[in-house]
């Protein structure tokens, strides 16, 4: 009997989400408006942060954040290479230079020591990455950033619902969350910038919408003059209320969704124990893992086949998988510009990383199906 294809991720969308979107469609106000304002308020309340600004993507959020920080030609921004390449792209498009640092071989996150070693006279910002739902050593990074007077912007795209030392990621400092389709909280496409820096938040809010002092809904609801002024040239990164309505329902469900992810991840850890799959290590500090991804490292010597062949074998059994990520400095554009750069841990992991299915609507027998498929694949290679 053939089984339905099991993707590595699928959004958990219920009747409440559908009803919320329908309500916005029927309201007559479908672009940025009251649902955006409510989402920003609810998100800030949950984190305990001072400011929250909704945007259309985390890439756009990072773009305007770095621009608001004054990053431009001649500047350097430190970031791990082992992350989605949009970070390097945004830095490059601003005329600055991404300075790639290596990650810990097992947590896949950069350390304060690696970051400090990369700081130079042109360093203007640090963009470290919370990885797969696990959390960075923020205290060390904050100390380094403060000592050198450099901005710290947390890439929290994987970390909505994660906690560091008992506090939500994003509750302090500046961070950017993603609401992309595969994230723990989704609105199809979207993001949230959070910060306790009022001036920075005000400029991000302005830059996300043409550089205008106010948006259309703000003018309508506060009775301001109909034609807003451009304070400075900006972009079109605002989030539609259609998306915000979806995100609001997901935010209410976030704890339950993440609890299900944790239960599934724990089952994987039990079921796959003893196999030569090298799951990621956990940092030493206290944290709450959001389990955005469940990642294996497929080493040809240990497993009898390489990562790509392993993924093909899963696909042949109706199981999806993904790669998170190919290190940025290995992409053609950046390899041409830094051909001698060597980051051993990032490169070793880039060749072996494999994300297997993990999403809240998975059943317990889906975990068993994946585990049995993996056992069968490895058994054939022994």
Swiss-Prot record:
Write out the GO MF terms. Answer: pyridoxal phosphate binding; UDP-4-amino-4-deoxy-L-arabinose aminotransferase
Pathway membership, UniProt: Nucleotide-sugar biosynthesis; UDP-4-deoxy-4-formamido-beta-L-arabinose biosynthesis; UDP-4-deoxy-4-formamido-beta-L-arabinose from UDP-alpha-D-glucuronate: step 2/3; Bacterial outer membrane biogenesis; lipopolysaccharide biosynthesis
Q: Which family does it belong to?
A: Belongs to the DegT/DnrJ/EryC1 family. ArnB subfamily.
List the protein's name: UDP-4-amino-4-deoxy-L-arabinose--oxoglutarate aminotransferase
Question: Does the keyword Ion transport feature in the UniProt annotation?
Answer: no
CC cofactor: pyridoxal 5'-phosphate
Name a single GO cellular component: membrane
GO biological processes: lipid A biosynthetic process; lipopolysaccharide biosynthetic process; response to antibiotic
Provide the reaction this enzyme catalyses: UDP-4-amino-4-deoxy-beta-L-arabinose + 2-oxoglutarate = UDP-beta-L-threo-pentopyranos-4-ulose + L-glutamate
Organism lineage string: Bacteria, Pseudomonadati, Pseudomonadota, Gammaproteobacteria, Pseudomonadales
Record's keyword annotation contains Lyase: no
Instruction: Please describe what this protein does.
Output: Catalyzes the conversion of UDP-4-keto-arabinose (UDP-Ara4O) to UDP-4-amino-4-deoxy-L-arabinose (UDP-L-Ara4N). The modified arabinose is attached to lipid A and is required for resistance to polymyxin and cationic antimicrobial peptides.
Q: Which gene encodes it?
A: arnB
Q: What is the species of this protein?
A: Pseudomonas aeruginosa (strain LESB58)
The EC number of this protein is: 2.6.1.87
């Amino acid at each position: 009997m053939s089984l339905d294809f099991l993707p590595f991720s699928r959004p958990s969308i219920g009747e409440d989400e559908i009803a919320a979107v329908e309500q916005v469609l029927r309201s007559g106000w479908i672009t940025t408006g009251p649902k955006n304002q409510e989402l920003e308020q609810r998100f800030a309340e949950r984190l305990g942060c001072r400011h929250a600004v909704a945007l259309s993507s985390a890439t756009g959020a990072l773009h305007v954040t770095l621009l608001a920080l004054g990053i431009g030609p001649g500047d350097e921004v430190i970031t791990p290479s082992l992350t989605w390449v949009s970070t390097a792209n945004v830095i490059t498009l601003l005329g600055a230079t991404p300075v790639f640092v290596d990650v810990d071989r097992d947590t896949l996150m950069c350390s304060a020591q690696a970051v400090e070693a990369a700081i130079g006279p042109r360093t203007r910002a640090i963009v470290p990455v919370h990885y797969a739902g696990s959390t960075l050593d923020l205290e060390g990074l904050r100390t380094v950033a403060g000592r050198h007077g450099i901005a710290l912007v947390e890439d929290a795209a994987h970390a909505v619902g994660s906690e560091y030392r008992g506090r939500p990621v994003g509750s302090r400092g500046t961070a950017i969350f993603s609401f992309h389709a595969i994230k723990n909280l989704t609105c199809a496409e979207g993001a949230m910038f959070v910060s306790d820096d009022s001036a920075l938040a005000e400029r991000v809010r302005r830059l996300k919408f043409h550089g205008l002092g106010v948006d259309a809904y703000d003018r309508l609801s506060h009775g301001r003059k109909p034609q807003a002024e451009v304070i400075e040239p900006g972009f079109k990164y605002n989030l539609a209320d259609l998306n915000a309505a979806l995100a609001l329902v997901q935010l209410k469900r976030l704890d339950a969704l993440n609890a299900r992810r944790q239960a599934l991840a724990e089952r994987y850890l039990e079921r796959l124990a003893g196999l030569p799959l090298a799951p990621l290590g956990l940092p030493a500090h206290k944290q709450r893992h959001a389990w955005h991804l469940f990642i294996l490292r497929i080493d040809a010597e240990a497993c009898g086949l390489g990562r790509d062949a392993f993924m093909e074998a899963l696909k042949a059994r109706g199981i999806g998988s993904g790669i998170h990520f190919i290190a940025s400095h290995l992409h053609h554009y950046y390899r041409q510009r830094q051909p001698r750069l060597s980051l051993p841990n990032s490169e070793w992991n880039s060749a072996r990383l494999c994300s297997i299915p993990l999403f809240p609507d998975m059943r317990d027998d889906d975990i068993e199906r994946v585990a049995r498929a993996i056992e069968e694949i490895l058994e054939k290679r022994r």
